[in-house]
Amino acid sequence: PKASSVSTRSPKGVTERDATWPQLIDLQAERKLANDERAHLGPLAKGAERDERGERETHAEFVEGRNRTTASRDGASGRELLQRAGLDPNDPRVRQLAHVVNGLHQLPRHRSIHVGGFILTEEPLGSVVPLEPASMPGRTVVQWEKDDLDPVGLVKIDLLGLGMLTVVQDCLLYIRHTRDVTVDLGQLDMSDAAVYDVMCRADTVGVFQIESRAQMNTLPRLKPRCFYDLVVEVALIRPGPIQGEMVHPYLRRRAGLEPITYPHPSVEHVLRRTLGVPLFQEQGMQVAIAAAGFTPGQADQLRRAMGHKRSRERMAAICEELIAGMQRNGIPEETARRIYNQINAFADYGFPESHAASFALIVYATAWLRHYYAPEYLCAILNAQPMGFYSPGTLIEDAKRHGVKVLPIDLTRSVWDHSLELSDGRTLYANDGTVRWGRNREQPTADNRELKTPPPHRDVSVRLGVRLIRGLGSRARRNLEAALQHGPFTSVENAVQRVTLDKASWRCLAEAGAFDSMFAHEPAERRRRAALWEVMAATRGPELPLAPRVKPTAAQQAPLPAYTPLELTEADFRMTGLSLAGHPMAHVRPHLALNGVLTAREAHEIGKDGQPVAVAGLVICRQRPGTAKGFVFLTLEDETGMINIVITPDRFEQHALLISTTPLLLIRGTLQVEQHVVNVRAKQFRALELGGGEQHVKGHNYR
């Protein structure tokens, strides 16, 4: 498929599609377009960059009017409330109470504002529904619940904010300046084998939608080789397919381990593209039309039931009609109920194929940019933080393993945001969607060539920005940015004179190594102490008449104690959450190796199922999905890469506190190897304490 063209700050957006798009993925038009049996048009979604979304919401209110935003609500059943109150459902008095309050079932518990919902009307909305001011100045909310808009035919548009769109736009902007070319996403080779090879290896840290543990475990099994494979990949790891037990059948069929079968010949043409396994909401509609004789309007009612947050009850109401229709078409009741059960799984958030296709486009674009323009991509995703699955430290460690040169924070070169440095000495600074070259540097003129293949290699490094340092607030940012507009700092004293910061902020800068380059005459292990000493002197305050400042001579100066390598790593992690001087695990690797503890890379290379192993690393991710039947999943990171850990429910109950709170773990267990996917099934857990800053790591915990 042909990707759409994107220019910087394009009003069309990254996921804009042309007129051929529905034909490419066989979209079900009834899902959005009105027909005789529909009482509503249905919500329309429009993606926007995260930073641009507020502009678009304001623009929509300015153009369309303040009276076109909508509200949403949460529901709660009466029985659920009784159980929360500790009441016995078998008590006659409680049952009588439940009967009395049954009419309150699913009424709103409280109201909340829909994140990005806008309503379009032909006439002033206030003449149709009641309005009220929102808590945010300048915003107005419709008092109706969003699902109440359908009966009166009001159109709701959702503005969706995606941080990854900001990353893509900024990355394209950086490339245009660092490589002197313009990347046109509409001209990308969507069959680039090198990009698919990367995804098949699950080398996808920082790639949109396919960077999670579950996606990384699926990619080597699915082995995507074309765009539609990515559409399937995006939709596969969702609650609907998982709870409907469709993931493993699809993967087994794709690998040739299970024959491709269909519930009934009448639905073969619907399920052929997903190997006989229903994955998309649109397929549920198409199956109802083909097998049960539903009209497009009836199929849309089914879709609405599948996608509704209270869809189980609505699905039960339509169940008998669906099964009866299939039986009228000669499908046995047992087969009909099996088909219905598969469709019913989508009541738990089956993914629309149209959404999956739009997401898959961003998946491929981000994988392509990361593969061919890793420095620019890293800079863009770091400047877009917080977002995504991994911390800046993990993103940087992964980029370094892929050959990206990352330079430390340096107040003679760094600004607030992360920047790019070229081998010829030029520095590209980025801020809020704009770029500028460093002071007294000549800016190259882009030749605007449309790029279909990567250009000749040019060395580009990422310079970390001051924003990474913990303890600096928005005031520090404003003051630092204003001062750096007039040139870099030349010394600690020069910086203190030009910028107004409190003493704590200056200490943070010194302890993070931001002044190290100003003390090049000192050994590397003493530079931070020298900087801290000078910062304390420069920020001491005005000279007092009875206590004049006396600068000691070189002979009088006492030698400052040196940082050990472990202390440097600890200081880095404490101040920034990462260290370019070395991963904490590297400091204890010789000791661990003597005790048979493997690196993440060694565990992957062994690849022998059932082999006992021991691994250790920083816990960068903890997950306990509701669809995993109590299993807990960890991701450990060491100096060579990452390894995934699987913990059974009983093991987790035994060691829950240790697993949930310890930043550095040594785990013994057995390897699980299936279709090139390597996990460790954990049996024993032990906390490690290095004093190397591991306690300052912020992981992705149970989200």
Label every model-predicted segment.
Residues P1-R703:
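Noncatalytic, beta-rich nucleic-acid-contacting surfaces in large DNA/RNA-processing enzymes
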